[in-house]
UniProtKB/Swiss-Prot annotation:
Species, as recorded: Staphylococcus carnosus (strain TM300)
Keywords, ordered alphabetically: Lyase
Any one GO molecular-function label of the UniProt entry: lyase activity
Top-level taxon of the source organism: Bacteria
Descriptive protein name: Putative hydro-lyase Sca_2211
Cross-referenced InterPro entries: D-Glu_cyclase, Putative_hydro-lyase, UPF0317
Pfam families: D-Glu_cyclase
Similarity comment: Belongs to the D-glutamate cyclase family.
Length: 262
């Protein structure tokens, strides 16, 4: 059986491309950056680029492809963004219409792909520090919630930010904050610790994306900005076509997470 925790990125991308790995990628290719994916028509690319720069906590931009290209010079030279993500979401005019395992049939030479930092990247550092992560212990995707906090609008893109949540003791929450200070390009420090109602989350048992996790009596919910935010703002921007990763199914890059820490 393949050791997916310690596999090289190129090998993991091939398994995903060949549909041999189809689940969420948290904990895979340990030590390498994982990225959220947004693929847009060129006409929307500049507005989305501005949106990322205005919202670095939720949309920390790692790389942009050349127009019509499926790879990235640094983050995945031999990659194919249309096949190397385990599951995609396809929106037309703000409506989710398809969740395919590749998007070759939709890609054309007037599309631009964006890689956005993902909190899965700093999970390795948290685990190395002895901070347990409940979603990994329970074997499923991290829970994500749409908040009532508006993102900074840019052109046609506006909407509320999405956060991911990891429960931990207050002691571990403080340590996690210190550790993620060094990962500014993959969401950085938490945006909130404690009461989810403070920013409009009514029920932690019903995430908007991912699966719920158990929160123990001695734990608090810790929230980080989440790169699923573009999916929620896409519903408002209503481009004729936007393709994203399905939550939890990240693009595995060739760059080590140590290159993003300071």
């Amino acid at each position: 059986m393949t050791d997916l925790q310690n596999i090289e990125p190129q090998a993991l991308r091939k398994l995903i491309r060949d549909k041999k790995v189809t689940g969420h990628t948290s904990g895979m290719a340990k030590g390498y950056i994982q990225a959220n994916v947004v693929i847009l028509p060129l006409d929307y690319a500049y507005d989305f680029l501005k949106f990322c720069f205005k919202n670095p906590k939720t949309c920390p931009l790692l790389d942009i492809s050349e127009v019509g290209e499926v790879n990235f010079s640094k983050y995945g030279k031999d990659a194919d963004i249309t096949t190397d993500v385990g599951a995609y979401r396809v929106y037309e005019n703000g409506e989710l219409i398809e969740t395919p395992t590749d998007v070759k049939h939709l890609f054309n030479d007037q599309m631009v792909s964006f890689l956005i930092g993902c909190s899965f990247t700093f999970e390795h550092a948290l685990l190395e520090a002895g901070i347990p992560l409940r979603h990994l212990e329970e074997g499923h995707n991290v829970p994500m919630y749409i908040t009532n906090i508006p993102a900074e609008p840019a052109g046609r893109f506006e909407g509320n930010i999405t956060v991911s949540m990891r429960p931990m003791t207050m002691k571990d929450a403080i340590r996690a904050t210190e550790i993620t200070t060094h990962f500014k390009n993959v969401h950085g420090t938490p945006i909130h610790i404690g009461n989810p109602a403070d920013f409009g989350i009514k029920d932690l048992e019903n995430p908007d994306f991912g699966e719920p996790v158990k929160i123990k009596d001695n734990e608090v919910p810790v929230f980080w900005g989440c790169g699923v935010t573009p999916q929620s703002v896409a519903l408002d921007a209503k481009p004729e076509l936007i393709i994203t990763h399905a939550p939890g199914h990240m693009f595995i890059t060739d760059v080590k997470d140590s290159e993003l820490s300071d």
